[in-house]
């Protein structure tokens, strides 16, 4: 049997941004309560040695899984230091990877309603839009 490789997109991220992400997730899960239903998996709960953490975010009947990695090969810049993030959208047996911009839009669509319903229309018309 021959080897089969699966390629996964991992975004190289500064470790301080990963720490900020983890603390932001924990704040919204345990303090503000805006992240109801989110599940945080620590590195010691994962069988994979490179996984630093996983956050499972329910989006209707699907979910977004954000996995942080450590110990990867260093990137082009010194500050990468082998840290990375992969973002996956899963629904039943189907999964696909998404980019950080789409993940941000999905999370804000379901959990953080920052603007009123008419904000998009006002923005398109050139009016100033402010959060609630």
From Swiss-Prot:
**Residues recorded with modification Phosphothreonine:** 96
The protein's induction, as recorded, is:
Expressed late during infection in a Rev-dependent manner.
Q: Where is this region: Interaction with host APOBEC3F?
A: 14-17, 74-79
**PTM annotation:** Processed in virion by the viral protease. Highly phosphorylated on serine and threonine residues. Thr-96 is phosphorylated by the mitogen activated kinase MAP4K1.
Q: Which InterPro entries match?
A: Vif (IPR000475)
Q: Looking at the record, which segments are called Interaction with host APOBEC3F and APOBEC3G?
A: 54-72
One Gene Ontology BP term is: viral life cycle
Q: How does it sit in the membrane?
A: Peripheral membrane protein
Family, as annotated:
Belongs to the primate lentivirus group Vif protein family.
Q: What else is known?
A: Required for replication in 'nonpermissive' cells, including primary T-cells, macrophages and certain T-cell lines, but is dispensable for replication in 'permissive' cell lines, such as 293T cells. In nonpermissive cells, Vif-defective viruses can produce virions, but they fail to complete reverse transcription and cannot successfully infect new cells.
Full protein name: Truncated virion infectivity factor
Q: Which organism is it from?
A: Human immunodeficiency virus type 1 group M subtype B (isolate LW123) (HIV-1)
């Amino acid at each position: 049997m021959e080897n089969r490789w699966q390629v996964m997109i991992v975004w190289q991220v500064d470790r301080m941004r990963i720490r900020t992400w983890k603390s932001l997730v924990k704040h919204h899960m345990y303090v503000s309560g805006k992240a109801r239903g989110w599940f945080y998996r620590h590195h010691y709960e994962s069988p994979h040695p490179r996984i630093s953490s996983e956050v499972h975010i329910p989006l209707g009947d699907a979910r977004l899984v954000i996995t942080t990695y450590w110990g990867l090969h260093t990137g082009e810049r010194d500050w990468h230091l082998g840290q990375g993030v992969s973002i996956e959208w899963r629904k039943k047996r189907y999964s696909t990877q998404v980019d950080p911009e789409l993940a941000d839009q999905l999370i804000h669509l379901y959990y953080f309603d920052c603007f009123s319903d008419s904000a998009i229309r006002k923005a398109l018309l050139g009016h100033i839009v402010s959060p609630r």
